[in-house]
Amino acid sequence: PETNLGIVRIGTDGTTAELLWGFKDGGKFTSEFPTHMMSHISRLEVDKKHRIVMHTHPTYTIAMNTVCPLDEKDFTHKLWQSNTEAVIVFPDGVGILPCMICGTNEIGIETAEKMKKFRLVVWTNHGIYGTGATMDEAFGLIETVEKTAQIYMLTLGKAVNIIPDDIIRGLAELWNLKPLDGVLK
């Protein structure tokens, strides 16, 4: 992992970066590094604690966005209906971008714009970005989406016993969370 992964600290002046770990033996930054930086800027404007930006390529999340409409509220609702943990972990929902050319400034700008509203942004047919105050928080967000997408895909959206909206609403109330407006019926 030290060749293909890296941990970078951005200087307090915002113009310098320091490699703390990784990219050994000729490893280099991903082509999506500019997207990471733009996402950092957007999330830090929303929450100063969100200093972690993580990008992964989770199989079931990618599979789910190939069979579901690219509608953020519908996609979020399907996740919330599949796992009671989902609304608790990401009550703000999941942002979605259409299929775009990765590694470009265009997708970076679009991702950064979504990051102003969402902590999670799915890149259709590619992967997901998650943010948080810690590595555990960012990974936990992504892992919860992936686990829930796996449940959805294993049932191919034909589950009979989905979680009703009143239960999702009750979970949100119990945990003092505000679900993304317009998702619950």
Residue ranges and their predicted role:
Residues 1-185:
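Glycine-rich flexible loops
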